[in-house]
Amino acid sequence: MHAITNSGWVEVITGSMFSGKTEELLRRLRRAEIAGQDVAAVTPAVDDRYGEATLGSHAGRSWAATVVEPTAEGVASIPTLLNGEQVVAIDEANFFPAELVDVCQELAADGRRVVLSGTDQTFRGEPFEPVPQLMAIAEYVDKMRAICMQCGEPATRNQRLIEGEPAHYDDPTVMVGAEETYEARCRNCHVVRRE
């Protein structure tokens, strides 16, 4: 793979929950910091599982982050929050509105490396915008896989469980949770109730 070095670019790390997306994002941030690059991290206000101003992984690793409201206005404020950082990390991109795509384009055009992580599918197995749009404009895309909690195969789906049972198709899309409300599942074991 030829690395881009003369301009900004966009990287997307995606996949199901528990696939290591945030771990990979944190790894890239650590490498950028070791290389002497200034790093800024952003996380949505809806995800406070690991602390108010923290980008955190299920494995317990974390990074200080600026909390941004997941609104058009909040996303538009991201460039104004920066102080010359060359690397901008955005975790849980799926919780931000479509305006995030234009902001990432702007940051990359300004010569910055933009690294995003977020799941590309809802619990229904449908596209979770704006991540698919971000994947389309990105120079680099990595799709991570977890392990299916039912059969052990590679998992690419988010199984939402409510009181231990698969969620209904009509349940709300956004519901921040951890192991008690979601499991990684493969295509064959993924269930969405429609009755």
Swiss-Prot record:
It is an enzyme of class 2 (transferase). GO terms for cellular component: cytoplasm. The keyword rRNA-binding does not apply. Its EC number is 2.7.1.21. GO terms for biological process: DNA biosynthetic process; thymidine metabolic process. GO terms for molecular function: ATP binding; thymidine kinase activity; zinc ion binding. It is found in: Cytoplasm. Pfam families: TK. SUPFAM superfamilies: Glucocorticoid receptor-like (DNA-binding domain), P-loop containing nucleoside triphosphate hydrolases. Keywords: ATP-binding, Cytoplasm, DNA synthesis, Kinase, Metal-binding, Nucleotide-binding, Transferase, Zinc. The active site is at residue 92. It catalyses: thymidine + ATP = dTMP + ADP + H(+). InterPro entries: P-loop_NTPase, Thymidine_kinase, Thymidine_kinase_CS. Zn(2+) binds at residues 148, 151, 186, 189. Signal peptide: none annotated. PROSITE patterns: TK_CELLULAR_TYPE. ATP binds at residues 15-22, 91-94. Homotetramer. NCBIfam families: PRK04296.1-1 (NF003296). PANTHER family: THYMIDINE KINASE, THYMIDINE KINASE, CYTOSOLIC. This is Thymidine kinase. It comes from Halobacterium salinarum (strain ATCC 700922 / JCM 11081 / NRC-1).
